[in-house]
Amino acid sequence: MTLKPLILIPARMGSTRLPEKVLAEISGKPMIVHVAERAKEAALGPTIIATDHDAIAQAVTAYGHEYVMTHTHHQSGSDRIYEALTRIDPEQRYNAILNVQGDLPTVTPNALISVLQLLKNNLTDIATLGAEIIEDNEKNNPNIVKIIGTPIAQNRLRALYFTRATAPYGNGPLYHHIGLYAYRRKALEKFVSLKPSTLEQREKLEQLRALENNMRIDVEIVDTALLGVDTHHDLEKVRKILA
């Protein structure tokens, strides 16, 4: 099946730890604009911001990007992009949906290309990225989500679990999950129809809902983890990177 991608960027105002972070200024532009620009550079398909707030819509429009308004109350970014998808594409022209977090301004075009490539395997429902953890302090940090997976090819895993704990035990690399996803459209439809699962709620990781319902997630291991913004400290680090 030929992949016809659509890139959706969920962006909301109601962040708990860093309010209005997607509008934070980085090198003269709002964070969300940096994300949209990198996504467009990948040239994979249309790039549209899914938002719940007029201020975000105005910010992205000022830089020539498209947006769609969604409801404020969604349990996850996946629910928001599914609502956006049904509004944008009721004709079902697009069969591969990339979910690029609005707080991931360090995303690269190559990262988007890499995650989409995983869907060329017809057995893969959802694709995502990971990177080896190098810093010791990150191995025990619950904010760094770890991937437990079985190797299926060079630099490629089939995910068995995601956790905030330090795992797996023993010698060998630990992998940091990068929150960038590519879904088959049918997989996204199935995912949002499922109730939040037991382990998802315990770990506070929505991707576990897919694994607990026998959906397959494949992971491409890339050289460098992409830095997302959850705190003021993260924001200052990103400002230095993108200066």
From Swiss-Prot:
The keyword Metal-binding does not apply. One of its GO terms (biological process) is CMP-keto-3-deoxy-D-manno-octulosonic acid biosynthetic process. Belongs to the KdsB family. InterPro entries: Cytidylyl_trans, KdsB, Nucleotide-diphossugar_trans. It comes from Bartonella bacilliformis (strain ATCC 35685 / KC583 / Herrer 020/F12,63). This is 3-deoxy-manno-octulosonate cytidylyltransferase. PANTHER family: 3-DEOXY-MANNO-OCTULOSONATE CYTIDYLYLTRANSFERASE, 3-DEOXY-MANNO-OCTULOSONATE CYTIDYLYLTRANSFERASE, MITOCHONDRIAL. Gene3D superfamilies: Spore Coat Polysaccharide Biosynthesis Protein SpsA, Chain A.
